[in-house]
Regions:
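Active-site cores that bind ATP or allylic diphosphates and position pyrophosphate for catalysis
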Residues: 102, 107-242, 248-254, 262
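Conserved phosphate-binding loops in nucleotide/dinucleotide-binding enzymes
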Residues: 83-87, 110, 189-190, 208-219, ...
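N-terminal Rossmann-like or analogous alpha/beta NTP/dinucleotide-binding catalytic cores
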Residues: 2-125, 222-235, 275
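Residue-level signal for inorganic ion chemistry
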Residues: 29, 60, 100, 104, ...
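Glycine-rich phosphate/pyrophosphate-binding loops
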Residues: 34-46, 199-212, 233-247, 461-466, ...
Length: 489
């Protein structure tokens, strides 16, 4: 498909949730295309049926849609170079492999699993790297045809040159060369007729006109074999962008097989999609020039400024604290009504009595870092927890259990006044403040005990008058009276 436009593809396997590293690959692939006004393609690589997970294709679709990484061509919307599901392209792979065999660039291998296991065991015993020994590499044509006619199981292997070097240029790691003698004759078609991952990638990418291949640095060692395939077919070699791994710590990679966080896990914990995407982009990539010190970027911002020269060669360590900080910044920047909409499901999971959610959210938003931590802050709304009266003692506010009883008794008539509008927080605060002035006390002397009386906690989403207005007059008066009784002993 000749074109001078950039064409990239994200080609995930439907094996479960969207791992952080996979989402980063999708993001970089999308940004590479969109920054250059190119085409972003979604292709589903489902030929490894042993790892296929039911429903995982929908996870891929939903994740990309939620994050705004919308594809221009793909299985659901079609395009000029479909089908976009690998298992629907099966007839191509055998055809291309047999073309290489006919041209002497690949060969049928009849070695059994038992022979290969014995070969590898012997190689390991001699301290060698395991590799295929080329047993079937130069079988006479007549013997090959006879064994094929007899129905003998086989694989098709790539015939790697034994001499010389194969080099390639990577946009991150630069020029890399590998001695051909160090490369194994890799399998292209397995005994069940299915293509291997490496072979299918090349045979899919070329007809789709892929110009830039973006993937993890673990594929650097396979890239010379990819190039030899491109050369064998006489096809143009795409640009390579290999990204450093995302690490859990200095020694261990993030891995969905080890239960490390997926995109779905992070959303379920209350991280915002936009914050996750922003943070993932910074895992192994840094902005340049005037944006070098900036950390908060919308997807539209990233489309404008992202270039592959910002990708690091060094592994990126997933830092949960950094993700929290970025998420907190996104929460603070939300319009109040949008924060309320996002926080409401978390509030409703913890509070089942009527409360002023708008006021609650006004107090939560400046303090909230992760939405999933909201419920644990609200466990006193439905029922007053048990607490010790020693909580009323506070040096800063100059309160004691005895002074708290005096303060609450002074507040009771103020809060009982039918004219006091509990829907207006400022009005309630001013009434309490006036009572403090009348008593010659500071506001905290009066309002700190009110907060304890209403929540049984030292830390709450809002001060005493905020809590009173969230709960309403009836609950407030019930709890203040109960607190006075508790303090009476």
């Amino acid at each position: 498909m000749p074109s001078n436009k950039v064409r990239t593809r994200f080609a995930p396997s439907p094996t479960g949730y969207m791992h952080v590293g996979n989402l980063r690959t999708a993001l970089y692939t999308y940004l590479m295309a969109k920054h250059e006004d190119g085409t972003f393609i979604l292709r589903i690589e489902d030929t490894d049926q042993g790892r296929y997970v039911e429903g995982a294709v929908d996870v891929i679709y939903n994740t990309l849609r939620e994050t705004g990484l919308l594809w221009d061509e793909g299985p659901d919307i079609g395009g000029p170079v479909g089908p976009y599901v690998q298992s629907e392209r099966m007839s191509m792979f055998k055809q291309y492999a047999e073309q290489l065999v006919a041209e002497g660039k690949a060969y049928y291998c009849f070695c059994t699993e038992e022979r290969l296991e014995a070969l590898h065991a012997e190689q390991r015993a001699h301290g060698e790297m395991t590799h295929y020994d080329g047993c079937c590499r130069d079988l006479p044509r007549e013997e090959v045809e006879k064994r094929l006619a007899a129905g003998e199981p086989y694989v098709i292997r790539q015939k790697i040159p034994r001499e010389g070097v194969t080099g390639f240029d990577d946009m991150v790691y630069g020029h890399i060369e590998v001695n051909n003698s160090e490369m194994d004759d890799q399998i292209l078609i397995k005994t069940d007729g299915m293509p291997t991952y490496n072979f299918a990638n090349v045979v899919d990418d070329h007809p789709m006109g892929i110009t830039h291949v973006i993937r993890g640095s673990e594929y650097l060692s396979s890239t010379p074999k990819y190039n030899l395939l491109y050369q064998a077919f006489g096809w143009n070699i795409p640009n390579y962008i290999h990204c450093p791994p995302v690490m859990k710590d200095a020694q261990n990679k993030l891995s969905k097989r080890n239960g490390d966080a997926s995109y779905q896990d992070l959303v379920a914990k209350g991280y915002l999609t936009e914050a996750i995407l922003n943070y993932i982009c910074l895992l192994g990539w840094s902005p340049k020039g005037e944006y070098a010190e900036q950390e908060i970027f919308s997807l539209a911002d990233l489309v404008k400024i992202w270039t592959p020269d910002g990708i690091s060669k060094s592994p990126a360590i997933f830092d949960p604290l950094k993700l929290r900080a970025i998420n907190a910044e996104y929460i603070r920047r939300l319009p109040p009504e949008e924060f309320l909409a996002k926080a409401e499901p978390w509030i409703d999971s913890a509070v089942h009595t009527p409360i002023n959610k708008k006021l609650l959210c006004a107090n939560l938003q400046p303090r909230c870092e992760v939405l999933g931590e909201i419920p644990e802050q609200l466990d006193f709304f439905d029922a007053m927890p048990e607490y010790d009266v020693s909580l009323y003692a506070n040096k800063k506010q100059k309160t004691t259990p005895e002074s708290a009883k005096e303060a609450l008794e002074a507040l009771l008539p103020v809060l009982s006044d039918e004219a006091l509008d509990f829907n207006d927080r400022d009005t309630v605060f001013d009434a309490c403040k006036a009572k403090a002035e009348e008593l010659g006390k500071k506001n905290g002397w009066l309002l700190y005990p009110l907060g304890i009386a209403l929540s049984g906690k030292q830390r709450t989403p809002g001060g005493g008058t905020d809590l009173a207005c969230m709960m309403g007059r009836e609950t407030t008066l019930e709890r203040v009276k109960a607190a006075i009784e508790k303090l009476n002993g």
